[in-house]
């Protein structure tokens, strides 16, 4: 399987909050979902291009919230005209209620309530306060924003809109086929050891097959 199996996305991110050609400026609002148990502990919010929600709990700075929103906007609107580049992805994200939660720390009240009460399909990743650094956008070990936002867009968007290419289940897509080759076989969970011919060795024991596929797509991009 060649790299042509992937629809690669260019990540030329400028990480600004207002775009040049047709301005897209973010306003930080109160939590519009506070009546829902899953989101009751979050305090501030940004709507990105009408199809991607970013929610943060108390203690997360406005600058970090704006940074996450800006990354999402750049990934969705790379020509910076104020419109999502792929209308089908926009519709899928909107219908699926794509949402990125920003949590203060692992085990916070917001995390506990979210994990206990959420039963939707629009959350594919979370970000923690310490994982966000607007001064080092995308820097490995300092800022995980690009990775986690992209996971959400891929999971809620691309996997739904283009299943022949990006479906995450075993034997379902070009992506799953390519990953099986890269791992040296089809493994539903992390093997004790990868075959010698494998070149994708992701080893998070909490990651199931679909999780591995999302991670593989990220590394492919």
Each language-model region and where it sits:
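Generic detection of long, well-ordered alpha-helical segments
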Residues: 13, 58, 62-66, 208, ...
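N-terminal low-complexity, Pro/Thr/Ser-rich intrinsically disordered segments
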Residues: 21-46
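Metalloprotease/metallohydrolase-associated module, dominated by Zn2+-dependent proteases
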Residues: 173-221
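Bacterial Sec-dependent N-terminal signal peptides
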Residues: 1-21
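A general structural signal for short secondary-structure junctions and capping/turn motifs
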Residues: 45, 89-94, 207-211
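Acidic/His-rich structured neighborhood in mature extracellular/periplasmic domains
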Residues: 49-189
């Amino acid at each position: 399987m060649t790299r042509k199996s992937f629809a690669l996305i260019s990540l030329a991110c400028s990480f600004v909050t207002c775009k040049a050609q047709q301005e897209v400026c973010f306003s930080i609002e109160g939590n519009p979902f506070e009546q829902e148990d899953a989101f009751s502990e979050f305090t501030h919010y940004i709507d990105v291009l009408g199809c991607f929600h970013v929610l943060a709990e108390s203690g997360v700075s406005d600058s970090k919230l704006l940074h996450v929103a800006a990354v999402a906007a750049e990934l969705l609107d790379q020509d910076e005209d104020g419109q999502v580049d792929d209308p089908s992805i926009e519709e899928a994200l909107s219908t699926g209620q794509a949402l990125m939660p920003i949590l203060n720390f692992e085990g916070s009240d917001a995390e506990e309530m979210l994990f206990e009460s959420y039963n939707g399909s629009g959350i594919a990743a979370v970000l923690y306060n310490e994982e966000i650094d607007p001064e080092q956008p995308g820097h490995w070990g300092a800022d995980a924003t690009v990775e986690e936002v992209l996971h959400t867009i891929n999971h809620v968007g691309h996997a739904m809109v283009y299943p022949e290419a990006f479906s995450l289940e075993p034997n379902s897509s070009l992506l799953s086929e390519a990953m099986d080759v890269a791992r040296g076989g089809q493994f539903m969970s992390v093997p004790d050891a990868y075959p010698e011919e494998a070149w994708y060795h992701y080893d998070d024991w909490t990651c199931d097959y679909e999780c591995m596929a999302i991670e593989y797509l990220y590394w492919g991009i």
